[in-house]
Amino acid sequence: MKRAYRLRTPEQYQRVRRDGRTWDAGMLMLNAAPNRRRLSRCGFVTPKRLGGAVTRNRIRRRVREAVRLLYPQIVPGWDIVFIARSPALAEIAFPQLQALVQQALQRAGVLQASDSGQSDMG
């Protein structure tokens, strides 16, 4: 994902945690808060309890890719933090992971019905 579409600083993550709402999707948790911008930004958290660096990085890469593919359908104007809750995210089939991410976004109400949105995620 391009830099403009990512949360980068600890303050940005803390603001989403403080001002946003939380949705539980089993192996994945989602925090979302409005950001008053014309685009949505995403951040990814993989706690150390999920395993070593290789496992955590694999989870983060896979979740980031699932979000990148769904990004054109995300409603602009949200900061969204995805929190991994299970080491199984490193091993489940990618279509299953995509469905999990999509379900979390739908529960949060930040997913548009059509896929007319931002593109060129690179």
Curated annotation (Swiss-Prot):
Organism of origin: Roseiflexus sp. (strain RS-1)
| Gene Ontology biological process terms, A to Z | tRNA 5'-leader removal
Annotated catalysed reactions: Endonucleolytic cleavage of RNA, removing 5'-extranucleotides from tRNA precursor
Gene Ontology cellular component list? ribonuclease P complex
Keywords attached to this entry: Endonuclease, Hydrolase, Nuclease, RNA-binding, tRNA processing
Keyword Lipoprotein in the entry? The reply is no
The upper taxonomy is: Bacteria, Bacillati, Chloroflexota, Chloroflexia, Chloroflexales
Role: RNaseP catalyzes the removal of the 5'-leader sequence from pre-tRNA to produce the mature 5'-terminus. It can also cleave other RNA substrates such as 4.5S RNA. The protein component plays an auxiliary but essential role in vivo by binding to the 5'-leader sequence and broadening the substrate specificity of the ribozyme.
The UniProt similarity line reads: Belongs to the RnpA family.
In its UniProt entry, what is this protein called? Ribonuclease P protein component
GO molecular function, a single term = tRNA binding
EC no. given is: 3.1.26.5
Q: How does it assemble?
A: Consists of a catalytic RNA component (M1 or rnpB) and a protein subunit.
